[in-house]
Amino acid sequence: MKTFTDRWRQLEWDDIRLRINGKTAADVERALNAAHLSRDDLMALLSPAAADYLEPIAQRAQRLTRQRFGNTVSFYVPLYLSNLCANDCTYCGFSMSNRIKRKTLDEVDIQRECDAIRKLGFEHLLLVTGEHQAKVGMDYFRRHLPTIRRQFSSLQMEVQPLSQENYAELKTLGIDGVMVYQETYHEAIYAQHHLKGKKQDFFWRLETPDRLGRAGIDKIGLGALIGLSDNWRVDCYMVAEHLLWMQKHYWQSRYSVSFPRLRPCTGGVEPASVMDEKQLVQTICAFRLLAPEIELSLSTRESPWFRDHVIPLAINNVSAFSKTQPGGYADDHPELEQFSPHDARRPETVASALSAQGLQPVWKDWDSWLGRASQTR
């Protein structure tokens, strides 16, 4: 059975880098006038040459976003269930080598978090854990997902890569979507940053979206950790290749792309390639032109000013008031966090800022009486 690994083996990192850097102003203009972007068009929009065309790129991205999603922007919040991790990764605050306090939420803790989150108004929840199969694996999910699911309209997960059979079971437990980020698509650089644990297996992670697609998960999230490799443009292009593969082979699923830039954390590394804010806007808008129908998400890793200015252009899914540590909504203990969020504003403040720009914050776009995609497909 073919997976994205087959396509990945056809892609040469240095060749893609040279092709992107070789794009000209004429290539960018051609891409801007294309009804549907080709791979070459995307390379042009990710290239240094596109920097001078940021305004027309953003204008077209905004038009496409409004045509597809109207003025709506969906809100979600992450719920961190555990910071236990069996991996040693250079860039993550949860890494097993970091001497931080560890915590896994029990039934009482989870209910306190759910109560606190519901008071904030959120209905869409992203469940996050460190990667620890023994203590925060399927047994843990079987025990606690039913309780959480009853209280929220939509549940998504960002946990360790699992088997196709596990994902099929999670679907029956009420999971609507799974986010899995490759971190970097450069195999050698990936190995430099993943020193111990199951996460060292580059291809197990690379093929996770294929397993999600075969399991029939409704929404699949893709992305790279921008700045981990020495060329963010190539990594972002590889995310696009992964997206195109998934859309072709698992067309029944919906897709989401996120753009996390490397943020400070305990024991963390400095970015190997720096993407500035204009380049992040360029990349987000390029993805909107490539795939007008997908969800583009922007988290609290970015500053309030940046989010307020970029969300109206091409973003249709945002987090707010995120706590990146287990138990953070009921009891805020920053020493447990995975990374330090940049936008710490309360959700109503973020919503007001977007409403002032003519956007409509959406806290809930599904109800249990309608049935769930995870149950009816």
UniProtKB/Swiss-Prot annotation:
Cofactor(s), by name: [4Fe-4S] cluster
GO MF annotation: an example = 4 iron, 4 sulfur cluster binding
What span is annotated as the signal peptide, if there is one?
none
Catalysed reaction equations from the record: L-tyrosine + S-adenosyl-L-methionine + NADPH = 2-iminoacetate + 4-methylphenol + 5'-deoxyadenosine + L-methionine + NADP(+)
Superkingdom classification of source: Bacteria
Radical SAM core domain ranges (all copies): 71-301
* Entry's cofactor comment: Binds 1 [4Fe-4S] cluster per subunit. The cluster is coordinated with 3 cysteines and an exchangeable S-adenosyl-L-methionine.
Q: What class of enzyme is it?
A: lyase
Q: Which SMART domains match?
A: BATS
What are the recorded Gene Ontology BP terms? Answer: thiamine diphosphate biosynthetic process
Q: What are the protein's UniProt keywords?
A: 4Fe-4S, Iron, Iron-sulfur, Lyase, Metal-binding, NADP, S-adenosyl-L-methionine, Thiamine biosynthesis
What binding partners and quaternary form does the record give?
A: Forms a heterodimer with ThiG.
Any idea what this protein is called?
Answer: 2-iminoacetate synthase
Query: Top-down, what is the taxonomic lineage of the species of origin?
Result: Bacteria, Pseudomonadati, Pseudomonadota, Gammaproteobacteria, Enterobacterales
The primary gene name is thiH
